[in-house]
């Protein structure tokens, strides 16, 4: 991890945490075409959409903070990851669970289910992918349940947490 970041600190559990800030212009020295390509997911027809832009913003922030190396989109559409760290070859998939889809607070289809998200996480890890968990749309209760499940399965070394407070490995 790079030294010299004024926003690097040790969390209450001893984990390394980097405060994230919205960086809309950081492109990591990429051309316009390369920057655009980061938002084009082959699994979604290589169209630039909201989800692709969100994923691009997340990986560029993690790259900028030194948590991952320079990334490209994984060109494999079927069973591919979202991104490949070109410095290590590690593939990364982003998961963005939501506690209450569409702002509803009642239990409904698509609502957070720790067992379901763990199945998805373990599937990615079994493929050799590490996982970036975007937990900005989880309640603190659901986030804690997910943290405990990850810890119980001993998957911490395969996860980067991305939330409102920062990113941490």
Regions of interest found by a model, annotated:
Residues 2-169:
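Catalytic toxin/effector domains delivered as secreted proteins or via bacterial secretion systems
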């Amino acid at each position: 991890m790079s030294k010299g970041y004024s926003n690097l600190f040790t969390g209450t559990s001893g984990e390394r945490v980097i405060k994230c800030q919205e960086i809309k212009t950081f492109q990591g020295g990429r051309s316009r075409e390369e920057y655009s390509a980061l938002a084009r997911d082959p699994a979604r027809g290589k169209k630039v959409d909201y989800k692709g832009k969100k994923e691009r913003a997340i990986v560029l922030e993690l790259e900028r903070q030194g948590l991952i190396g320079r990334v490209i989109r994984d060109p494999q559409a079927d069973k591919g990851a979202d991104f490949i760290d070109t410095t290590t070859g590690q593939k990364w998939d982003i998961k963005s669970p939501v506690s209450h889809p569409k702002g509803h607070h009642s239990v409904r289809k698509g609502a957070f289910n720790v067992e379901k998200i763990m199945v998805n996480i373990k599937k990615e890890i079994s493929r050799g992918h590490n996982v970036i968990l975007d937990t900005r749309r989880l309640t603190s209760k659901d986030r804690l349940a997910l943290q405990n499940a990850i810890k119980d399965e001993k998957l911490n070394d395969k996860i980067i947490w991305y939330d409102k407070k920062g990113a941490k490995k």
